A protein has these predicted regions:
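N-terminal Rossmann-like NAD(P)+-binding subdomain of aldehyde/semialdehyde dehydrogenases
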Residues: 1-120
């Protein structure tokens, strides 16, 4: 089973409940199994997010902008894997929809947010 990311750490979910994504074109279950987080995981994630938001509020705008640009670059570096998985989970065509529209829109929004942070 996949782990949950809470407070920067991948860990086992508190609950043993899980689900699998299904390819809507074939109705076949995809191989990965994902946890259904319970309230303990949700509370821990929310507490970590609150703490991170407070820390992030004190960062200079350029640091936030640099992070957003690096995030966009990371998505682009892994674009083939992201598009492939999104295709399996949604049955949307890899091209043009996912690779040529959705992924560039996502990275474009991240870069626009980075530019806005730099501009103040």
């Amino acid at each position: 089973m996949q782990k949950v990311l809470i407070n920067g750490q991948w860990r086992d979910a508190s609950s043993s409940s899980s689900f699998q994504a299904h390819n809507p074109a074939t109705c076949e279950a995809l191989p990965d199994e994902y946890p259904v987080s319970d309230w303990n995981d949700c509370d821990a994630a929310l507490a970590a997010a609150e703490s991170a938001a407070a820390a992030m509020a004190s960062l200079p705008a350029t640091a936030v902008a640099d992070f957003l640009d690096r995030y966009a670059e990371g998505i682009e570096q892994h674009s083939e894997a992201i598009v492939s998985l999104a295709n399996l989970e949604t049955a949307l065509p890899s091209s043009p929809r996912l690779a040529d529209i959705e992924l560039p829109r996502t990275t474009g929004q991240l870069r626009a947010a980075a530019a806005a942070a730099r501009e103040g």
